[in-house]
Every structure is written in C-alpha cells, then in structure tokens.
C-alpha cells in the first residue's frame, strides 16, 4: 500500500496542452503521442483514441451474473455478437474508442470486452471502482483496502487477465452513504497515485456533484481529473457552470435517454425520463456559449445487455434508440452543427477533451 505522501507525489506531474483537431470522425493530425491510455487490448497513445464516447457499457449486470446465467442474455455468444454489431455501427459513424464504465459490481467481464473490442476494431477502456451493487465482502472494506483494490486493477490488472483499468467509476444518488464516501475517497487516492481519472454517476436533479466535489477536494484531487456524470439529467445551468468553473468535466452522457412516446410505460419512464434528446443536446451548446467547451464530455450511456432492471427494458431501449452507441455521431453532432457549433469545437469535445481526460498525465489548461 502506498502512503499518502507517495500518492500525492505521484499525482504531481503536469502535461502539455492539447490543440483542437480539424475533424471528429477520426484523428486529423496529432495531439501528442508521449502518453498512453490503458485499453482492454493494451495501452494506446492518445492520438490513437480518436472520437471517444466516455460513458458506455457493453453489459449492465451484477457481479458474476453473466457467467452464472448467460442464457438470460440469450447466450454469452449472442451478447457478444450484438455488441460487435453495435460497435461496428458506431465505428462506421466515426467512433474509435468507448469507455466502458462497468465496474466489478456492474458485472464487468473484461474478457468479453477484449473479445468484442478485437472483433469490432474499437478501443475499449475498462473501469475499476464501485457502483451501487457491491457485495458484502466489498461493503466491509476500509478506505485503505478499497484504495488497494482500485490500485491493483489499474497497476496490475483486473482479475488474472493482465488488462488494466483506465478509469475509476463511482456513484451516488442523493446524499452519499458512509460507504459511498469511503469509495469516493478511495477513488481520489487511487487517482492521485496513478493519474487515472475518475468518472461519477449522479442524480443531477439533486446536485450530487457538489458533495462529490467536496469529498474529492478534501483528498487533494484536482477537479480536472473528475467527470461529473449524468449532468444532462438537469436543466439547472447554474449548477453545471459552477462545477465547470472549478475545473470539473461535465458529463452529458444520457442524451438519447427519453421515454417520450412511452409515457404509459412506468419502467421506461423511470429509467429514461421524459425529456427530449434535443433538450439534452442543447445543454452542450449552452455550456459552449458560456465558455466551457473544454469541460464537456459526451456519451450515450448505452448497453447491449441489461439485467439490473426489469426483464424487457433492453427491448424498450432498442426501440427508443435504434442507433445505439452511434447516436452521438449520427444525431447529436449534426444537430449541433445545424445550431451553429463549429467543426473545430465539435472535434474538441469528442476527440481532444476525452484524450486529455483519459491521459494519466495531461491536464486541462
């Protein structure tokens, strides 16, 4: 276990600034090659990452569920094939990298991620951290032990695969529980030790990002290493700009989530909400107009299998968004372009910002 002194010293490195790129379907030029990002196929240079979706899932489940009951998803092979088809569609639309923020307790299967990544030729960054479904053996751990677990998955590898995590995922909904506070503190310490960034799940309508920020800052973690997720679940621009002004990345990652037309489906409405994707996408432009282009990350929070909700929810979601992970490049980017957002800005949001965030040493200006 590293001491806090070592942890803080390890986090002190600063990097060079990144310039904008001319296109966002692929990397048009170089944004630097000296730093590397862990993916399930091994480290890549930041210039290889390209158009990146920063909050996605191949499968949303619980620890061990896929291995114990693959037939729930048809079969493991069927799930893999669906994921490959979806990622190939996203790749054809310009996506080169996704960040799969499935943690141990979301049923993360990094062998599946590696298989799908190879077949679809899309880079996948795997996550350590914890969500809302940790087993008792995790809930009994101290902050020091949780830090050790996160560091193991970043520095040594996940399980016995040798695949290293490239991001730390944590979650709160409303006021953090005492255990969630420990998880956030452990995430901050692991990030300080490694440079690997932290991304969060929030209930944006309850302004969760404010408490999360306070916990991270109490541990000495720079806001530039944290993305406050699901931030498009609110229209409270003052809440978002206050976080952005402090240096936090703002994750607008629920954009295709809308149960409009399905208002009579209580499960869909509870999960997806009744807000149009256009309303969510306009938050991107609002933050750009406020001068926070460098603080924006966009994604879909989409999946190809989902067992941690009602049984038929994946069928409903596929009807809501048949584009899957291709939704951002196929729908949102053209929409923003029509609203007058320049191509260079769109490239900054989808290529430069994610590369800077995922890089263990590069920092925001």
Curated annotation (Swiss-Prot):
What catalytic reaction does the record list?
An aryl dialkyl phosphate + H2O = dialkyl phosphate + an aryl alcohol
Q: How is it modified after translation?
A: Predicted to be exported by the Tat system. The position of the signal peptide cleavage has been experimentally proven.
| Gene3D superfamilies for the chain | Metal-dependent hydrolases
Q: How is the cofactor bound?
A: Binds 2 Zn(2+) ions per subunit.
Q: Where in the cell is the protein located?
A: Cell membrane
Q: Enumerate the UniProt keywords alphabetically.
A: Cell membrane, Hydrolase, Membrane, Metal-binding, Plasmid, Signal, Zinc
Per its UniProt record, the required cofactor names are: Zn(2+)
Write out the residues that bind Zn(2+) 1: 55, 57, 169, 301
Query: What PROSITE patterns would the database entry show?
Result: PHOSPHOTRIESTERASE_1 (PS01322), PHOSPHOTRIESTERASE_2 (PS51347), TAT (PS51318)
Name the EC number(s). Answer: 3.1.8.1
The membrane topology term of the UniProt record is: Peripheral membrane protein
A Pfam family this chain is assigned to: PTE
- Is Cell membrane among the key words of this record? yes
Q: Keyword DNA-binding on this protein?
A: no
Q: Which domain of life is it from?
A: Bacteria
Q: What class of enzyme is it?
A: hydrolase
Give one GO biological process term: catabolic process
Q: What function is annotated for this protein?
A: Has an unusual substrate specificity for synthetic organophosphate triesters and phosphorofluoridates. All of the phosphate triesters found to be substrates are synthetic compounds. The identity of any naturally occurring substrate for the enzyme is unknown. Has no detectable activity with phosphate monoesters or diesters and no activity as an esterase or protease. It catalyzes the hydrolysis of the insecticide paraoxon at a rate approaching the diffusion limit and thus appears to be optimally evolved for utilizing this synthetic substrate.
Q: What is this protein called?
A: Parathion hydrolase
Q: Which organism is it from?
A: Brevundimonas diminuta
Lineage runs: Bacteria, Pseudomonadati, Pseudomonadota, Alphaproteobacteria, Caulobacterales
Q: Which gene encodes it?
A: opd
């Amino acid at each position: 276990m590293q001491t806090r002194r070592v942890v803080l010293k390890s986090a002190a490195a600063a990097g060079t600034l990144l310039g904008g790129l001319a296109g966002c379907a692929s990397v048009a030029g170089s944004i630097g090659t000296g730093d590397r990002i862990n993916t399930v196929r091994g480290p890549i240079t930041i210039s290889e990452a390209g158009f990146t979706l920063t909050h996605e899932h191949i499968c949303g489940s619980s620890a061990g569920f896929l291995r114990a009951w693959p037939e729930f998803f048809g079969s493991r092979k069927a799930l893999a094939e669906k994921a490959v088809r979806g990622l190939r569609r996203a790749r054809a639309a310009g996506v080169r990298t996704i960040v799969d923020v499935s943690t141990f307790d979301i049923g993360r299967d990094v062998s599946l991620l590696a298989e799908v990544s190879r077949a679809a030729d899309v880079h996948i960054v795997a996550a350590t951290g914890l969500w809302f479904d940790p087993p008792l053996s995790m809930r009994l751990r101290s902050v020091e032990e949780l830090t050790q677990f996160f560091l193991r998955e970043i520095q040594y590898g996940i399980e016995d695969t040798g695949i290293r995590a490239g991001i730390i995922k944590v979650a709160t909904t409303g006021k953090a529980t005492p255990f969630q506070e420990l998880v956030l503190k452990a995430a901050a310490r692991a990030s300080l030790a490694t440079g690997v960034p932290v991304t969060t799940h929030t209930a944006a309508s309850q302004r969760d990002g404010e408490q999360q920020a306070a916990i991270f800052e109490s541990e000495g973690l720079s806001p530039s290493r944290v993305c406050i997720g699901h931030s498009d679940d609110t229209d409270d621009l003052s809440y978002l700009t206050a976080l952005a002004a402090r240096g936090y990345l703002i994750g607008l990652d629920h954009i295709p989530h809308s149960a409009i037309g399905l208002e009579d489906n209580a499960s869909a409405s509870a999960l997806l909400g009744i807000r149009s994707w256009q309303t969510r996408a306009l938050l991107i432009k609002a933050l750009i107009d406020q001068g926070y282009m460098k603080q924006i990350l966009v994604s879909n929070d989409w999946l190809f299998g989902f067992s941690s909700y009602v049984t038929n929810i994946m069928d409903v979601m596929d009807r809501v968004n048949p584009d899957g992970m291709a939704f951002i490049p196929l729908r949102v980017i053209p929409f923003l372009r029509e609203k007058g957002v320049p191509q260079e800005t769109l490239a900054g949001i989808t290529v430069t910002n994610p590369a800077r965030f995922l890089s263990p040493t590069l920092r925001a200006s």
